[in-house]
Amino acid sequence: MKKLKIGITCYPTVGGSGVIATELGKMLAERGHEIHFITSSVPFRLNKIYPNVFFHEVEVNNYSVFQYPPYDIALASKMADVIKEEQLDILHVHYAIPHAVCAVLARDMSGQDFGIVTTLHGTDISVLGEDSTLAQAIKYGIDRSDAVTAVSEALKQQTYDLIDTKAPIDTIYNFVDENVFKPVDLGNLKEQFGVKEDEKVIIHISNFRKIKNLPDIVASFFKIREKMPAKLLLVGDGPEKHRIMDQVKASAYKGDVLFLGKQENITELFAISDLKLLLSEKESFGLVLLEAMACGVPGIGTAIGGIPEVIEHGVNGYIVELGDTQAVADYAVQLLQDEDKLASFRQAALYSVSENFHEHKIIKQYEDLYERVVANKNDSKTMAQRD
């Protein structure tokens, strides 16, 4: 396909949407496209120099006349500047609000008829979509986009349920860089964490928000621990951390729970893990599950949102109902005490990632989408010239 000039806007901090947006930009650059990140800071995963990747900082000044910093206006203005200067073909924004709305405003400001692609990641729909004061803004951003994608079928359906839009939505799953997330042997790392030979390692990684349901993670682990020797690695930080620490301190198994805080090299932690738990109350996809599976770690997740689209029950993990910590424990013990079954689940996890979420497959889907948007724009311009 023709090499395109593509702008990407996302939240540059740690989080699934920022990770996917940044990795997408890097992989598109490796395929020869020119990528322009338009964000408030350098995306944290943009850790390599590319000759065809550019960063345009959105500077937000604090003016005394405004109660809050005018990020949205500053972003739209920066988008318009970059669009005119670089002659972008596509602006791919992650989140309907504020980013899609800002993109539409930037198109009006710049006078350039470029294509707007909006990817819905979950929070913009599952949380904000339930706020009646924001629903119309979300609908506006979606309806004025030239193409809209969702990271799971569940999120796509939820969008139609919550937002009164008739816009077509394509499901394009998240992906992982399999050069980074892959099985490695780091058995010596277990010793550093005090993991004994007969202990299995269970891992949970999140931002420790209430929605991630940490109390059930810990409660499930304690039930597992009653049946077998194991360690729980809690990776991350956030508002629920102190509450969870209190829950752990009250248990006889407090010495088997390790709080590791935020970690950069989570592939090393997956290398010593046997099972991933994700028991969220809401989850549009569950990128961390995919990262674990790419390292050969099966998972147990709740029957929520896009999680059942990642975990195939009884094949590469298990699906449980929200709140059913006994089922989590039963499945975990059943799996972790059967080495043959665990090995089978590990292989199935690797196969699932390669077959359904391979980076090249997903990138090709985005390229096809961009090509379609650009072709439609060119057709519209041709028709307008004839008229």
Task: Describe each region flagged by the PLM.
Residues I8-G15, K26-Y71, I169:
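N-terminal strand-loop element at the rim of the active site
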Residues A154, F175:
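Carbohydrate-associated surface elements
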Residues K196-K212, V218-F221:
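Conserved donor-binding/catalytic core segment of Leloir-type glycosyltransferases
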Residues M245-G261:
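Nucleotide-activated donor-binding/catalytic signature segment of Leloir-type glycosyltransferases, i.e.
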Residues K262, E281:
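Aromatic "clamp/platform" in nucleotide-sugar-dependent glycosyltransferases that forms part
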Residues P298-G301, I311:
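Short hydrophobic beta-strand element within catalytic cores of glycosyltransferases
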Residues H313-G314, Y318-T325, Q334-D340:
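Conserved acidic donor-binding segment of nucleotide-sugar-dependent glycosyltransferases
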